[in-house]
Amino acid sequence: MIFPLLLTLILPNFVAPKVLEPEKDDEIAVSTQREKTFFDMKLILTKLPTFEPSKYGHINIPLRKKRGIALHPLQWASYLWPNAEVPYDIATHYTSTEKSIILSAMEAFKNVTCVRFRPRAATDKHYLQINKYFNVERCFSYIGRQSSRTLFGTPEGNVETRMRLDPACLRGNGRGIVMHELMHILGFYHEHQRDDRDRRIVGSAVHYNFKIYRRAKTLYMGAYDANSIMHYNFQNLPWQRRDHFSTSDIININTFYKCKNLLSSKLAPKVPISPTSTSTTAITTTNTTTTKL
């Protein structure tokens, strides 16, 4: 069964503001049917500017105007998790090894940010729900905290922000993949979908994972960061081989979640940065089909 793909942002009415409905991340197919080639793409990674700790990356905050008036920050605040706290519920059918990988990824945020993932309490109405499909290998997540207006309210009146992590997502560099998906849960898009991407990466892409999001939908600040955990490793699509945050990832999270005591640039030397490739690489990924709701 192919789960629907939703990439639609419903903006609030300025006169009578509605709660913003977060977007769902693009699915990442992890099928092992290598004989089914979906696309081949050559990319050239150009020399990137040195990252400046005083500048930040991007988050999915709408930056649009209606009747000449910018949307008030309170109208997009529902994208973020209050108090930088994310209650979660992990399905019971994960193995102990799979669950430990998920928890290890959550712990990575605790080490360098004020964001905390904690088990859901009975009183938590909004929470992250981590589950998997059966007989289908996929990993995907929604972008940002779901609102009460989305399709995923439960009969009890709770609201799930859904993440799907299948066994294939948790093999190899599973921890890095989960960290990537958790960044989406916190509200971040892919770094390579920035609207200044084509100044850094040369080539044509026909896959939805490379759709560029304009500034009207995403707020960008600072230099493009190919070392971000939100940037695809083009040599190994669709898998992420990074298992650590870049300096900009840490600053982005701490900035938008107001982790004031962790914003010091002294963090930078403590975070390993993957070397940037400058070679031309051919990429092949597998066949997949997506539909829209």
From Swiss-Prot:
It comes from Caenorhabditis elegans. One of its GO terms (molecular function) is metalloendopeptidase activity. This is Zinc metalloproteinase nas-2. The active site is at E181. Its EC number is 3.4.24.-. InterPro entries: MetalloPept_cat_dom_sf, Peptidase_M12A, Peptidase_Metallo. Its main location: secreted. The keyword Zinc applies. The gene is nas-2.
